[in-house]
Amino acid sequence: LLTVHIPGRGEQILQTAFPEAMVDLDQHQDHFSSVSGIKAYSSIAIGPGLGQHPDSVKALEQLLQVVEKPLVIDADALNLIAANKDLLKRIPPRSILTPHPKEFDRIAGESTNSYERLKKAQAFATDHQLCVVLKGAYTAICTATGNVYFNNCGNPGMATAGSGDVLTGIILALLAQGLELSLIHI
């Protein structure tokens, strides 16, 4: 089952578009501000549609304090982590980060070129025991063991708003099915 934690204002829209999704309403109407019952879920993704409200930073911090299983982290969750670097050390090992180049630069520091960014992503994944899926024309998948895989089968149609959110959902679905993380990377 899919459960989506959303602010109250989004319930009608979500239920209309995806009636099969279970809804866990946030205590706030307009933004993510709380974490409840999080340990009940087999896999968790955070970021798409999250926003950057100060309450969301606190809620993300709460999430990172209680969750021990790997997370899929994307979009505004990456931006919140970039703005609050102390959250980096709280990300559970084997989590999967899915930044585009600018999001990654916000977390790891500006890169002068793609090669430097790739080397940083590889070191970052190893140092933090994470997987970094660095999205782009040739998506690079950097694993915690230092391996780097490339996916060159993208197309210009994927360079549009929302396609990264779809990738996050696909990775989350694979985690929820219990697929071994090393297979998800490829």
What are these regions, as identified by a protein language model?
Residues L1-A75, N79-I96, P101-I184:
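Small-residue (G/A/S/T)-rich helix-start motifs and N-terminal tracts that mark the onset
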